[in-house]
Amino acid sequence: MLLKSIHHIAIICSDYEKSKAFYVHKLGFQVIQETYREERGSYKLDLSLNGSYVIELFSFPDPPERQTRPEAAGLRHLAFTVGSLDKAVQELHEKGIETEPIRTDPLTGKRFTFFFDPDQLPLELYEQ
């Protein structure tokens, strides 16, 4: 099997409108398609970043809360590259999004920081 790339990442949110606004209006994802699935009472929102299909945002009635801690087994976080970490952090702060202090990766020497989506999913900004 030869894997070519990651096709998408699926995220289940607890408040669809809040998460949609966060990813679209605060982080700048573009809406590819929004579908209401009546049989499930839920939405599926396909989002792209710079023209590449990246995230499926799902809403389900009463989803259970996220149970994992950042260091638990399984998916830990999603990381996005940025040109200027200082500028990206400033933009997040201007939009009311708090970030952790900027740190330096001891293995690569690159700077990074974390912030959280409305459901406390850890998101990382990693400077190129």
Swiss-Prot record:
CDD domains: VOC_Bs_YwkD_like (cd08352). The keyword Metal-binding applies. Pfam families: Glyoxalase. It comes from the Bacteria. A divalent metal cation binds at residues 8, 56, 77, 124. InterPro entries: Fosfomycin_Res_Enzymes, Glyas_Bleomycin-R_OHBP_Dase, Glyas_Fos-R_dOase_dom, VOC, YwkD-like_dom. PROSITE patterns: VOC. GO terms for molecular function: metal ion binding. The keyword Metal-binding applies. Residues 5-128 form the VOC domain. Keywords: Metal-binding. SUPFAM superfamilies: Glyoxalase/Bleomycin resistance protein/Dihydroxybiphenyl dioxygenase. NCBIfam families: PRK11478.1. PANTHER family: FOSFOMYCIN RESISTANCE PROTEIN FOSX (PTHR36113:SF6), LYASE, PUTATIVE-RELATED-RELATED (PTHR36113). This is Uncharacterized protein YwkD. It comes from Bacillus subtilis (strain 168). The gene is ywkD.
